[in-house]
């Protein structure tokens, strides 16, 4: 039998166990709050920046090229960019990518932070630029740190440091969002990698899978970048070969300028930031509104403050409730449209230069593996016609310029839609882009031709679409430039239809359809004429055999004359010298030239033909003998028409 003391000890232990269990249960029920570093967040959610799956290598090359172009254009430097990637370790999918440019470079004290620290960038201003979040280069550094033990190699020669070049070996501390500087070295003259006065070079090793589809996307991205940046030299190198996209023009667009925000898009955060910028100057709210926002005059600012009923005092003396009233009044007030002179569109001359020599990378699949012949080459597509149109609009209280171009015919054999935003090619998610909606909604009859004509004359077995415009040999280019592009996702691959954006894109495309309509109608007439000429050539030998003996004329000369008249009739002009003889035979080698009177009415050139009686007599003779021959043959067995039989077949 247990003693009383033993029972008490056991009871106490049971109570302690119950209390401990209750405390543990309470701890499990509590929510733990932790702060995650920016770098850790983006690495864990890499799809937000597009770095996912097979697109890692594509996004890395894209970000490097865009950074290089921004660096050159910001200081009005004609870009020379070299980009390469090669497979280091096939078993582990390790790739070495390298990019070098002749831009302004990065000061040596800013290189580690600019390359490795997330949300640290010079792009967080109201300005048109390719970058959106300033995370592209940081994602490359973080992924290199996460998947490999090889640091980033960086060379930088900044224009601010009198042509001194520094070399860095860097990694990212993903847990703290801070750079790890393994090496920093001032290079001697014989150790320098960058040839120009300034520039930037980076080498990184990434783990990434590369499928044939992704590889083609990389090739297409580089090709399309050269279209909207024809003033740049792009050198692109892979294990399959090296290609160079030459500079087609030395004209560069004016660099984009920083601009004050528009008051129509004001919110509490923007207003507080504007007040903080004037905190040391003890400025009134009136001064803050006039100096921190565009299109706000002194009278307009007074009107806003009066309507809000908050009075004029030092900007830092307003409560949050009073500032909210200011924001609400600004959203209700009508302001002038934002300025567009700070934007940097491509422009007609530059885009036309890109369209006239459209570079595209071609993979040679017939190369012998034993030969040292490169698989990659550049094909240049030259159209017969290009056209350009642009519109200025406001989207979400931000100025936006819509540019549209068309390249038609020539080396272009099929339809293709090119999409660009702030001079960046957009290759993915075309089906959800506003440009695809515009193509679908603007009908082909804007060209003055019917869908039936297009489908009959431009039937393309490779085209899977039943839309008439997609049967034409035509490339359509859409470019949107703004201080903030309405992307659908952070990956910057498709643009949303916001505000009046679609309306102005439709207007541009309609303009271009009208401009190319004359060329398309001309080609349709030429195809019809060729069909009729084949028919004439089929019947001419039959007519010559029937009438040559009755009129005692050499069949060869008669056939030649008939063929010449048929060709000139189809072309609508006679090219032989003028004949003044009254007596003229159909077999004479000289045929009178048709006289053309050319007039221009409202920009339309028209030709009026004046045919001499001699030529008219010749045509009447042909018609007479053709009619007589047709009646004669109708009494005999019908002669089969091989042209029609071919058409039926």
Sequence positions of predicted segments:
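C-terminal extensions
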Residues: 319-391
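Acidic ATP/Mg2+-coordinating residue in the GHKL
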Residues: 101
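Bergerat-fold GHKL ATPase/HATPase_c domain
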Residues: 2-78, 109-116, 254, 259-265
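ATP-lid-like helix-loop hinge signature
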Residues: 68-98
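Charged regulatory segments coupled to nucleotide-binding catalytic modules in large multidomain enzymes
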Residues: 2-20, 35, 209-231, 241-273, ...
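A short glycine-centered beta->alpha linker in the GHKL/HATPase_c
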Residues: 105-107
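Helix-hairpin-helix
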Residues: 288-306
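GHKL-type ATPase core
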Residues: 19-26, 121-273, 313-329, 336-338, ...
């Amino acid at each position: 039998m247990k003693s009383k003391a033993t029972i008490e000890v056991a009871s106490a232990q049971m109570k302690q166990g119950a209390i401990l269990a209750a405390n543990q249960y309470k701890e499990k029920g509590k929510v733990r709050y932790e702060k995650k570093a920016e770098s850790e967040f983006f690495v864990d959610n890499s799809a937000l920046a597009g770095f996912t799956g097979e697109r890692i290598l594509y996004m890395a090359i894209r970000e490097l090229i865009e950074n290089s172009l921004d660096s050159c254009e910001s200081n009005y430097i004609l870009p020379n960019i070299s980009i390469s990637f090669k497979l280091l370790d096939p078993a582990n999918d390790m790739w070495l990518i390298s990019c070098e440019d002749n831009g302004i470079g990065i000061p040596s004290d800013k290189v580690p932070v600019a390359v490795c620290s997330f949300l640290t960038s010079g792009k967080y201003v109201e300005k048109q630029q390719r970058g959106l979040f300033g995370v592209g280069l940081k994602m490359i550094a973080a992924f290199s740190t996460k998947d490999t033990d090889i640091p980033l190699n960086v060379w930088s020669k900044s224009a601010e440091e009198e042509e001194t070049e520094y070399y860095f070996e860097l990694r990212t501390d993903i847990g703290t969002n801070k750079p790890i500087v393994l090496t920093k070295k001032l290079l001697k003259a014989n150790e320098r990698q960058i040839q120009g006065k300034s520039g930037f070079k980076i080498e990184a090793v990434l783990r990434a899978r590369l499928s044939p589809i992704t590889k083609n996307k990389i090739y297409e991205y580089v090709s399309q970048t050269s279209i909207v940046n024809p003033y740049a030299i792009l050198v692109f190198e892979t294990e399959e070969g090296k290609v160079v996209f030459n500079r087609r023009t030395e004209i560069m667009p004016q660099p984009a300028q920083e601009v004050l925000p528009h008051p129509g898009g004001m919110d509490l955060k923007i207003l507080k930031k504007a007040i903080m910028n004037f905190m040391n100057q003890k400025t009134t709210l009136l001064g803050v509104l006039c100096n921190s926002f565009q299109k706000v005059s002194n009278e307009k600012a007074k009107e806003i403050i009066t309507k809000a009923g908050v009075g004029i005092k030092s900007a830092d003396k307003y409560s949050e409730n009073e500032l909210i009233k200011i924001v609400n009044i600004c959203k209700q007030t009508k302001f002038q449209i934002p300025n567009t002179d700070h934007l940097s569109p491509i422009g007609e001359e530059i885009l036309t230069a890109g369209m006239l020599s459209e570079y595209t990378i071609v993979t040679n699949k017939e190369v012998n593996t034993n030969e040292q012949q490169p698989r990659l080459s550049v094909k240049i597509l030259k159209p017969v016609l290009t056209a350009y149109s642009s519109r200025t609009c406001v989207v979400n209280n931000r100025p936006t310029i819509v540019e549209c171009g068309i390249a038609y015919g020539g080396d272009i054999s099929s339809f293709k839609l090119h999409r660009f935003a702030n001079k960046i090619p957009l290759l993915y998610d075309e089906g959800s882009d506003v440009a695809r909606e515009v193509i679908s909604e603007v009908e082909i009859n804007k060209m003055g031709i019917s869908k039936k004509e297009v489908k009959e004359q431009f039937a393309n077995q490779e085209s899977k679409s039943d839309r008439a415009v997609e049967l034409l040999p035509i490339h359509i280019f859409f470019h949107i430039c703004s201080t903030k592009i309405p992307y659908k996702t952070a990956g910057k691959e498709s643009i949303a239809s916001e505000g009046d954006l679609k309306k102005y894109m439709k207007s541009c495309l309609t303009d271009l359809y009208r401009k190319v309509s004359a060329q398309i109608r001309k080609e349709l007439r030429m195809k019809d004429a060729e069909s009729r000429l084949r028919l004439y050539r089929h019947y001419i030998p039959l007519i010559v055999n029937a009438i040559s003996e009755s009129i005692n004329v050499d069949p060869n000369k008669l056939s030649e004359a008939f063929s010449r008249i048929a060709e000139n009739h189809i072309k609508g002009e006679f090219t032989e010298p003028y004949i003044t003889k009254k007596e003229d035979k159909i077999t004479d080698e000289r045929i009178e030239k048709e006289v053309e009177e050319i007039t221009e009415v409202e920009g339309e050139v028209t030709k009026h033909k004046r045919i001499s009686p001699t030529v008219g007599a010749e045509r009447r003779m042909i018609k007479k003998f053709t009619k007589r021959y047709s009646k004669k043959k109708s009494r005999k067995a019908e002669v089969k028409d091989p042209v029609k039989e071919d058409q039926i077949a």
